[in-house]
UniProtKB/Swiss-Prot annotation:
Its EC number is 1.4.1.24. This is 3-dehydroquinate synthase. Keywords: Amino-acid biosynthesis, Aromatic amino acid biosynthesis, NAD, Oxidoreductase. It catalyses: 2-amino-2,3,7-trideoxy-D-lyxo-hept-6-ulosonate + NAD(+) + H2O = 3-dehydroquinate + NH4(+) + NADH + H(+). HAMAP family: Arch_DHQ_synthase. It comes from the Archaea. Belongs to the archaeal-type DHQ synthase family. The gene is aroB'. InterPro entries: Aldolase_TIM, DHQ_synth. It is an enzyme of class 1 (oxidoreductase). One of its GO terms (molecular function) is 3-dehydroquinate synthase activity. The lineage of its organism: Archaea, Methanobacteriati, Methanobacteriota, Stenosarchaea group, Methanomicrobia. Catalyzes the oxidative deamination and cyclization of 2-amino-3,7-dideoxy-D-threo-hept-6-ulosonic acid (ADH) to yield 3-dehydroquinate (DHQ), which is fed into the canonical shikimic pathway of aromatic amino acid biosynthesis.
Amino acid sequence: MKKKSVWIKADEGGWEEQKDRITTGLESGADCVLVNPGDVEKVRELGNITVAAFARDNKSRADIVVVGKRGEGDGTKPLPQEIPGSFDINAATLLMDKGVTVGGYVVIKDKHYEHFAAEMGKICDYLLVTGTDWKVIPLENLIADLQHQKVKIIFGVKSAEEARLAFQTLEAGADGVLLDSGNPQEIKDTIKAARELESESAELEAAVVTRVEPLGMGDRVCVDTCNLMQRGEGMLIGSQASGMFLVNSESDDSPYVAARPFRVNAGAVHSYIKIGEKTRYLSELRAGDPVTIVDSKGKQREGIVGRVKIESRPLMLIEAKARDRTLTAILQNAETIKLVGKDGTPISVAKLEKGDEVLVRLEEGARHFGKKIEETIIEK
């Protein structure tokens, strides 16, 4: 899941207009705000967010200094005949030499500016490019030219629709977008688009239940998140890293307890949980840790752990077969604990029977400290 960042451009108009953009961005989960140097501290008073500032020095103590406004980058000054004579590139180089995180800002007016942007991208941490007439071709060219550089390409857009196109240009897409819009809905939709595109779908398949056996008492982990989950959403949990069950959130009401859609009653303390491309032990999770929420179609999104409870409870062994593999999970023996059926419908472990089909995720290879490795391993 490659991170796609959203920057909010808030350097024009009065402070109240800029403030509205910034607060909407903060509330919606934007990654960075780009302002004028005099507004850096004002932004920090509003909330905790990365602040970039248009400048040629770092007197504002911004997290990122962006060079190019009122320079060659935006066309205020003419482009240099030779790169070593560039006003903007020299300023960026001096800042980089001082250990400052630097962005280069270039408005793509024609092919000459595209070449200039590529040169800026070779020395800066970030390359912010925008067009006078929004086109994909310059972005494609820059992604191709700079694919082996460390620079992150942030493409200027005015809507969520343009952002989606920028994120999906070529295979890699832009690393982020610089959104220039005062429309609160466009800000929210752009950030939503970024988060959706960060997540690759998990390939789920049906496994046939072969064994359901009550066990004795043991310690189980309950994961309470800072996120509300829908029916059919939960987490991938299992006793083997090579295959995990989709354990449903407590999103359904029952005769005994109200729904708790923020919770996944996840499994015994030894169990693995899949988080992104890695696995962790359930018992290792702490408040503030990221988790991966998965639905019955395999769509993934990031969640945040709010609290983890480990308590002694009666347990149940679930065994199922998918392809030629036998998978197991040990869950709490209670009606509110559910796996997700082949059709996306949650099935309580208390009603689970041999022959039922439930959704699982199979993995190839083994795991070493949670990372996938090419190795033969047998887990029973």
